[in-house]
Regions:
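Conserved beta-loop-beta/alpha segment of the NTase-like Rossmann-fold superfamily
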Residues: 1-58, 92-94, 100-103
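Catalytic-core segments of class I nucleotidyltransferases/pyrophosphorylases
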Residues: 9-10, 29-33, 62-164
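Alpha-helix boundary/capping detector
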Residues: 19, 26, 122, 143-147, ...
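Terminal low-complexity segments of carbohydrate-biosynthetic enzymes
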Residues: 160-175
Length: 175
């Protein structure tokens, strides 16, 4: 709080990596510059995965932008208002600090950012931006492996040898 002062700030969760032509944070900063309020980075997830994320109830505004009406932390499939998930990227106004100071523990006995954002939404408009790019959940073992392979294959100095390694391993897999 003392470092940020009275400025909006970005929160990037370390278990989410986004590969995009225009960096995800740049996309969100552009949205912030237009709307001048908190922006949540979102993408659609499969309905069966809504219980892994903060899920939004939204009103579509334009193109990739939604106005947030409500949010639910890790709802059941039946209770999810949509399949639009908050995916580890936020630009938040400093008002959130006043809310966090008095925020009660939520799911898992922890202070949940989603709960604090719900309170913030009663004080100011919050928008969601459906960012472009491939998101990897590197907190998940398979997501970590997918990111490692995809990023290695993009590196010119690794690509040929790594591709040969993958082909060798794939040939060993019995079907």
């Amino acid at each position: 709080k003392s470092f940020i002062g009275d400025e909006p700030f970005a929160v990037l969760l370390g278990d989410d990596i986004v590969d995009a032509e225009v960096p995800c944070l740049k996309q969100m900063i552009d949205a912030y510059d237009e709307y001048k309020t908190s922006i949540l980075g979102v993408q659609e997830v499969a309905n069966e995965n809504v219980d892994k994320y903060g899920i939004l109830d939204v009103k579509h505004i334009e193109d990739r932008v939604y106005k947030v009406k409500d949010m639910v932390e890790k709802p059941s499939v039946e209770d999810a208002p949509s399949n639009i998930a908050i995916l580890g990227r936020y630009i938040i106004t400093p008002e959130i600090f006043n809310i966090l100071e008095t925020q009660e523990a939520g799911k898992g006995g922890e202070i949940q950012l989603t709960d604090a954002l719900q309170t913030l939404a009663t004080k100011e408009a919050i928008y969601a931006y459906n960012f472009e790019g491939r998101r990897y959940d590197v907190g998940d073992k398979l997501g970590f492996l997918e990111a490692t392979v995809d990023f290695a294959l993009k590196r010119p100095e690794l690509r040929d040898e790594f591709e040969a390694f993958i082909k060798e391993k794939a040939a060993c897999i019995e079907r």
